[in-house]
Curated annotation (Swiss-Prot):
Pfam families linked: GIDA (PF01134), GIDA_C_1st (PF21680), SAM_GIDA_C (PF13932)
Any one GO molecular-function label of the UniProt entry: flavin adenine dinucleotide binding
Protein name as annotated: tRNA uridine 5-carboxymethylaminomethyl modification enzyme MnmG
Encoding gene (name): mnmG
Similarity comment: Belongs to the MnmG family.
Primary role: NAD-binding protein involved in the addition of a carboxymethylaminomethyl (cmnm) group at the wobble position (U34) of certain tRNAs, forming tRNA-cmnm(5)s(2)U34.
Compartmental location: Cytoplasm
Origin: domain of life: Bacteria
Length: 633
């Protein structure tokens, strides 16, 4: 039977991608249905209890700048906040927060349940309704049919999921949850390229059985960083430390002795695991010369007895897990509450997606999250928001929402996936972005909030706060440019104590802040110069814009040069082997990827600037230089 109400957008899955997708579509006015196999697990952290990190924190800030939920939820559920790379430049500084799993999940659920235009329904989805290569709805496990104009699949590791502990395995989407077999079979019958990936998680330990006195405490930052542009420190619950310990040679010997029963090393698992979050058995094999590996002992919540030993993800048999855990300093009497495991699951080649995350073969069908080969809550949430927004825009018959690589890490993420695909779980790093000086955490709102407002993602309260901040920053910049200090100024004696070279001529306050030894906060302490602006976030923005103005201008020039050829078209039937000077490797990669434009060709791994120059020379020589008006969706 058909459900009585038809929807604009249906989102399948209530994880990090699904919640952001459903919330985005609903904020934009689309009548949205979120279908999940269990409402109680909406927003659940399946693996590590943390949000953010290098590259990942940037994605969370961007999700937040577009009105998403993740940053606000972690501000309400974060029990330890740190700024990583704090001693480095602003481009690579990143916020990371340890989460109380329950508080975080409750915060997400509260946001979801209070979102207008969003309906929840608990049922697994077994089938898609497809007519004339267009999705028209879904069919649930009990045969109930829901009609929709767009469908977003955010099914995580549930598609054909198989859980491995040693040589034992069973079907599962994650520990305690059933897999999605019927939907996996349905998708495999469609013309998508499909493969298998693997991820894993460590055993959870009972904190009462650990000796924290022999471990190194790792406190959070003080004052605590705030994740959301709408957040504040008053939201944060009680803050507690994490701890650090290490594996040792005995640990490694135990692991080596169990490799003959490892599903990874005996070929039982065929899927490729995450390169940047390897299992402990992978680490001791790949880095055989290392005598120890660091373990971050992370509490799972303020009222939880469980801790997450970050760094010893494993799918070894339980007896080996027990022995390796108890060989670690502080874990000698550890009780394992939940065994570690690996999970193998289906993912679909993201090169079969448009930049909107709509599939190329089925109109109105969008994929987001681990189904596209990514790993991590943050990568999933970013894709979910973009997919949900584009699903709503398609229903509303409006232009798609596509972010360029120079506009957002979201743009880098989706362009990497859609252009190059992935053979292993894809994780975001700042190093993946060519223009990371422009794509900082601190300016995510100035890059994206106005764009979000234009398409309906950003509400009135966020828009008002954003405009207040931007006005404060601009007003202060104008003041600093217009206020001058000369050698006889009343502030000069105090100022000279802060400077390497004393004031010998007239300087604007802006020029003084540009000096390496001077900061905005220091300068504002001088009575006749300060007090400046109270908001530390706006003050940081003022200082960064002044100190990095030259570097930012140069990067903007680079972008302008690149964009001159970004949309230069490559003929669909182009024979790359005829281009003199291209290596066989480059020819093979271009032939396989068939990039539509010079811009897309330049982002294929292994395609050098020299190869791009040869392509442009060839196009010009043969009168083939043409540009497309708009990047294809």
């Amino acid at each position: 039977m058909f459900y009585t109400e038809a929807f604009d957008v249906i989102v399948v899955g209530g994880g990090h991608a699904g919640t952001e997708a459903a919330l985005a579509a609903a904020r934009m006015g689309a009548n949205t249905l979120l279908l999940t196999h269990n409402i109680e697990t909406i927003g659940q952290m399946s693996c590590n209890p943390a949000i953010g990190g290098i590259g990942k924190g940037h994605l969370v800030k961007e999700i937040d700048a577009l009105g998403g939920a993740m940053a606000l939820a972690i501000d309400k559920g974060g029990i330890q906040f740190r700024t990583l790379n704090s001693s480095k430049g602003p481009a690579v500084r990143a916020t990371r927060a340890q989460a109380d799993r329950t508080l975080y999940k409750n915060a997400i659920r509260d946001i979801v349940e209070n979102q207008e235009n969003l309906t929840l329904f608990q049922q697994s989805v077994d089938d898609l309704i497809v007519e004339n290569d267009r999705v028209c709805g879904v069919v649930t496990q009990m045969g109930l049919k829901f009609k929709a104009k767009s469908v977003v699949l955010t099914v995580g590791t549930f598609l054909g999921g198989t859980i491995h502990i040693g040589l034992e395995n069973y079907r599962g989407g994650r520990a305690g949850d059933p897999p999605s077999i019927a939907l996996a079979d349905r998708l495999r019958a469609l013309p998508f390229r499909v493969d298998r990936l693997k991820t894993g998680t460590p055993a959870r330990l009972d904190a009462r059985s650990l000796d924290f006195s022999v471990m190194q405490p790792q406190p959070g930052d003080s004052p605590t960083p705030v994740f959301s542009f709408m957040g504040d420190r008053a939201m944060h619950p009680t803050q507690i430390p994490c701890y650090i310990t290490h594996t040792n040679e005995k640990t490694h010997d135990i692991i080596r002795g169990g490799l003959d029963r490892s599903p990874m090393f005996t070929g039982v698992i065929e899927g490729i695991g995450p390169r940047y979050c390897p299992s402990i058995e992978d680490k001791i094999t790949r880095f055989a010369d290392k005598t120890s590996h660091q373990i971050f002992v992370e509490p799972e919540g303020l009222n939880s007895i469980e801790v997450y030993p970050n760094g010893i993800s494993t799918s070894l048999p339980f007896d080996v897990q027990m022995n390796l855990v108890r060989s670690i300093k502080g874990f000698e009497n550890a009780h394992i509450v939940r065994p570690g495991y690996a999970i193998e699951y289906d993912f679909f080649d993201p090169r079969d997606l448009k930049q909107t995350l709509e599939t190329k073969f089925i109109q109105g069908l969008f994929f987001a999250g681990q189904i596209n080969g990514t790993t991590g809550y943050e990568e999933a949430g970013a894709q979910g928001l973009v997919a949900g927004a584009n699903a709503a825009l398609q229903v509303q018959q409006k232009d798609p929402f596509i972010l360029r690589r120079d506009q957002a890490y979201m743009g880098v993420l989706i362009d990497d996936l859609a252009t190059m695909g992935t053979k292993e779980p894809y994780r975001m790093f700042t190093s993946r972005a060519e223009y990371r000086l422009l794509l900082r955490e601190d300016n995510a709102d100035s890059r994206l909030t106005a764009m979000g407002r234009e398409i309906g993602l950003v509400d009135d309260a966020r828009w008002a706060k954003y405009n207040d901040k931007m006005e404060a920053v601009e007003t202060e910049l104008q003041r600093l440019r217009g206020q001058w200090i000369h050698p006889d100024h009343a502030a000069t004696p105090q100022l000279n104590t802060m400077l390497k070279n004393p004031v010998s001529r007239e300087h604007s306050l802006e020029e003084l802040i540009r000096r390496p030894e001077m900061t905005y906060s220091q300068l504002m302490k001088i009575e006749s110069v300060g007090p400046g602006i109270d908001d530390p976030i706006a003050a940081e923005q003022v200082e960064i814009q002044i100190k990095y103005a030259g570097y930012i201008a140069r990067q903007m020039d680079e972008i302008a040069k690149t964009q001159r050829h970004e949309n230069t078209l490559l003929p669909i039937d182009m024979d790359f082997s005829k281009i003199s000077g291209l290596s066989n490797e480059v020819v093979a990669k271009l032939t396989e990827a068939r990039p539509e434009t010079i811009g897309k060709a330049s982002r294929i791994s292994g395609i050098t600037p020299a190869a791009i120059s040869l392509l442009l020379v060839y196009l010009k020589k043969h009168g083939m230089l043409r540009k497309q008006d708009k990047i294809s969706a």
